[in-house]
């Protein structure tokens, strides 16, 4: 019997692969992946006028009511197809394109979608707006017209034959084909119950669900710093809004009071029945499409935030919280007192020496950087000075004997070398730092080693510096660990605090940068360097993700530059090139590719220790 079942499963899998391949409208041999062109498409999108904070991401398949042929109906395919769309946060393109039988055409289609998205605005009518954007793009760049015509002609050959469609669908198909050939020539489109076959050269409306009708959502910038209910999933699944009709109608087949009477005789402990199931979202698992019903306000009760540890095991707070602003790119305004930042000391920290494994490297670094102290140095080849520069005089004598007599300084002068530099290092301590880089190193281990070696370097140079770490749990709880302030000396107490660091929560980067800017701005040194060590994008549990977090961080970096600071980012995220140039500038960051580079990359070290 088991053998029969295996044969049936094998035959079923073979049939499934066969029928899906035959029913697929794609050309697998000419498939082009978005990942291979994502960087170039991002550059093209921004160069053509697209918003700098908009990223290029993969689009999920969308439900479309299409007319499918017999093979597609038997295979159960083409019910969901990926289409391109754009909103204020992302340009969503299909994860791969195999629309055309040639690789070059699929690549040109990706480029065309990026170009038309840069021209696109708010969509009011799908067909008329796409015609208008296409017409404007071709008028602005006439050299694109031959390439566009090739894409259109190849696309029209793959579309359904209007002669084989019902009258209403045939009329709509003819109008769409005319709109593709001559953009702007069609203003009225026939109504049809079925959607036309996807037009791969056009953008589709964004998948917006509208504002959720949750009564406990706090309006941005208003209200107190309250903690919203937990359990809100960050997973991006397909969704549709439906009316909650569970309270209407229905036949009552039992008496509800009987349930209470029977439960009184059952020996069950129901003290935990009313608590919130924190794993409910995980247990339900991902779905292609979910139903989002309006949520009703629940009754009041005692709400405990189990995300934070007990006070006996938590970091030690330093004073009251600090209210900080936050940039809202949607409203284009700085929301005052929107974030609460709490300065803290690492819990359980004790004075500790430098780990033995780092001692040889630390000694070598101290020897390399001790010569940069504010000591008096001899300047050679000066036009005047207190002593004769014998090497310069010897070179001058040899050149004169050979017939050359170039003017040069023949004296040496001793001057004070003043660096006049203050530096603050800000380390990202989010929960993602608990991940492993390889079999031996975690991200938090690399961060700790970087902090220790950075402290050894600057203590050898003698520059004033400070060390801080940060993580966050929504805007009400931005936690900033003080490892070493500018007033404190660097010693075993600071080393112990660094070695006691643990992964925290999330990464509200803008608030941490603003507080670091305030601390560093109070220094009297002429040059002020703000170093940020991180492992990924800014994000938090609330609205602080995607473009919102990137825009707020960029605004915080710009505020720091306006105050005369030099922000510089050090990251281990291999995808940092997609967003860090926008936040810190093309030369404002560097990438650590190997854990052995935790002793700080050369670019950051040169910028941190270069004499003023």
Curated annotation (Swiss-Prot):
PROSITE patterns: VWFA
InterPro entries registered for this protein in UniProt: NorD/CobT (IPR051928), VWF_A (IPR002035), vWFA_dom_sf (IPR036465)
Residue span of region Disordered: 220-246
Superkingdom as given in the UniProt entry: Bacteria
Positions of the VWFA domain: 420-609
Role of this protein: Component of the anaerobic respiratory chain that transforms nitrate to dinitrogen (denitrification).
Protein name as catalogued: Protein NorD
The organism of origin for this protein: Stutzerimonas stutzeri (Pseudomonas stutzeri)
């Amino acid at each position: 019997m088991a053998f029969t079942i295996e044969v049936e499963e094998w035959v079923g899998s073979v049939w499934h692969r066969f029928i899906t391949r035959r029913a697929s409208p794609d050309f697998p041999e000419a498939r082009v992946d978005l990942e291979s062109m994502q960087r170039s498409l991002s550059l093209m999108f921004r160069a053509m006028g697209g918003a700098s904070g908009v990223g290029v991401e993969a689009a999920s398949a969308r439900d479309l009511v299409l007319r499918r042929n017999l093979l597609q109906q038997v295979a159960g395919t083409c019910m969901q197809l990926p289409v391109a769309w754009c909103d204020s946060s992302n340009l969503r393109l299909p994860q791969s394109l195999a629309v055309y039988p040639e690789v070059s055409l699929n690549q040109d289609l990706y480029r065309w979608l990026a170009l038309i998205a840069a021209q696109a605005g708010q969509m009011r009518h799908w067909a008329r707006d796409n015609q208008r954007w296409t017409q404007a793009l071709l008028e602005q760049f006439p050299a694109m017209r031959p390439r566009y015509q090739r894409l259109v002609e190849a696309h029209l050959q793959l579309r359904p034959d209007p002669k084989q469609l019902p009258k209403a669908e045939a009329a709509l198909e003819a109008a769409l084909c005319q709109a593709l050939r001559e953009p702007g020539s069609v203003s009225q489109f026939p109504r049809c119950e079925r959607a036309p076959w996807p037009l791969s050269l056009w953008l589709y409306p964004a998948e917006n669900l509208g504002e959720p009708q949750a009564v406990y959502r706090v309006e941005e910038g208003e209200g107190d710093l309250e903690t919203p209910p937990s359990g809100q999933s960050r997973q991006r699944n397909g969704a549709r809004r439906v009316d909650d009709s569970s309270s209407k109608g229905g036949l009552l087949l039992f008496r509800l009071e009987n349930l209470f009477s029977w439960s009184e005789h059952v020996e069950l402990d129901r003290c935990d029945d009313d608590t919130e199931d924190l794993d409910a979202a995980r247990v339900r698992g991902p779905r292609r499409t979910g139903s989002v019903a309006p949520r009703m306000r629940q009754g009041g009760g005692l709400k405990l935030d189990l995300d934070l540890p007990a006070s006996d095991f938590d970091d030690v707070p330093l004073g009251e919280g600090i209210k900080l602003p936050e940039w809202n790119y949607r409203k284009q305004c700085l929301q005052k007192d929107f974030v609460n930042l709490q300065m803290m000391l690492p819990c359980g920290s004790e004075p500790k020496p430098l780990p033995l494994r780092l001692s040889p490297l630390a000694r070598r670094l101290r020897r390399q950087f001790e010569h940069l102290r504010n000591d008096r140095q001899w300047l050679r080849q000066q036009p005047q000075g207190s002593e004769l520069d014998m090497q310069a005089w010897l070179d001058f004598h040899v050149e004169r004997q050979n017939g050359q007599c170039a003017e040069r300084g023949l004296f040496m002068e001793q001057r004070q070398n003043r660096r006049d530099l203050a530096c603050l290092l800000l380390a990202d301590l989010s929960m993602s730092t608990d991940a492993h880089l390889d079999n031996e190193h975690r991200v938090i281990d690399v961060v700790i080693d970087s902090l220790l070696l950075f402290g050894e370097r600057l203590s050898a140079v003698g520059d004033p510096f400070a060390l801080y770490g940060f993580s966050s749990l929504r805007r009400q709880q931005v936690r900033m660990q003080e490892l070493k302030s500018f007033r404190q000396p660097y010693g075993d107490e600071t080393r112990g605090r660094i070695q006691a660091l643990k992964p925290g929560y999330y990464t509200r980067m803008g608030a941490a940068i603003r507080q670091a800017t305030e601390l560093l701005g109070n220094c009297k040194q002429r040059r002020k360097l703000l170093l940020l060590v991180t492992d990924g994008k800014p994000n938090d549990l609330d609205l602080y993700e995607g473009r919102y977090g990137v825009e707020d961080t960029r605004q915080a970096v710009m505020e720091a530059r306006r105050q005369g600071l030099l922000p510089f980012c050090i990251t281990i995220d291999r995808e940092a090139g997609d967003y860090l140039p926008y936040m810190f500038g093309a030369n404002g960051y560097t990438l650590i590719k190997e854990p052995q580079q935790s002793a700080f990359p050369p670019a950051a070290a040169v910028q941190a220790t270069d004499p003023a």
